[in-house]
């Protein structure tokens, strides 16, 4: 989405903002963006090794704003596979419903930790190839790969991952 761009428009709960493209990783379909207009709190990131098959996950995004409007939408699902398409070990397969506008958004565990980044879904091309319409077959790059891209921008103030026993569940924070 950002290939070749030095800046992009980003939808936020406060409206549309401009973001600079700091770094990209085409192999994992990731980019590091810096929003203009202030400082924003960092989100806690959980290591990929903590994720389990069947674990509840969610994303927040601005899908299909022309139809669904500009308010953020939360969708929940599960980790359907510990590997992505074609058993790609860099990604999770998720049952979280995603639409255009969710791509690039954080995938959260039930404690509000970022565990991945939503990158793709099976859609019409898969339906043409298989004769069946995929339902909630979506993918997120694991947090380990996102952290590698973010490493130059992290500092000591980055929050530690929330612990299961001491932190509220994701649905209590939304």
Go through each PLM region and give its residues.
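Conserved hydrophobic positions within beta-strands
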Residues: 19-21, 79, 107, 114
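C-terminal cap/linker of serine protease catalytic domains
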Residues: 18, 41, 62-70, 114-174
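Catalytic nucleophile loop of clan PA
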Residues: 97-118
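Short Gly/Pro-enriched turn/cap motifs at secondary-structure boundaries
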Residues: 22, 96-98, 142
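Conserved active-site neighborhood of the chymotrypsin/trypsin-like protease fold
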Residues: 1-69, 88-91, 154-165
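Extracytoplasmic/secreted envelope proteins and their assembly/folding machinery
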Residues: 2-7, 30, 37, 57, ...
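Short, compositionally biased
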Residues: 70-83, 130-132
């Amino acid at each position: 989405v950002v290939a070749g761009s030095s800046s992009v428009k980003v939808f936020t709960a406060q409206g549309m903002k401009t973001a600079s493209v700091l770094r990209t990783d085409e192999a994992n379909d990731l980019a590091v963006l810096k929003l203009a207009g202030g400082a924003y709190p960092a989100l806690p990131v959980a290591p990929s090794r903590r994720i389990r098959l069947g674990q509840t996950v969610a994303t927040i995004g601005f899908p299909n704003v022309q139809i669904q409007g500009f308010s953020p939408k939360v969708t929940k699902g599960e980790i359907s596979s510990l590997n992505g398409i074609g058993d790609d070990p860099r990604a999770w397969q998720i049952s979280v419903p995603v639409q255009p506008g969710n791509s690039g958004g954080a995938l959260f565990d039930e404690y509000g930790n970022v565990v991945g980044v939503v990158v793709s879904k099976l859609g019409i091309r898969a339906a043409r190839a298989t004769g069946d319409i995929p339902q909630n077959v979506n993918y997120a790059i694991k947090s380990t790969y996102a952290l590698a891209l973010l490493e130059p921008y992290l500092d000591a103030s980055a929050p530690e991952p929330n612990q299961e026993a001491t932190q509220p569940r994701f649905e209590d924070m939304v």
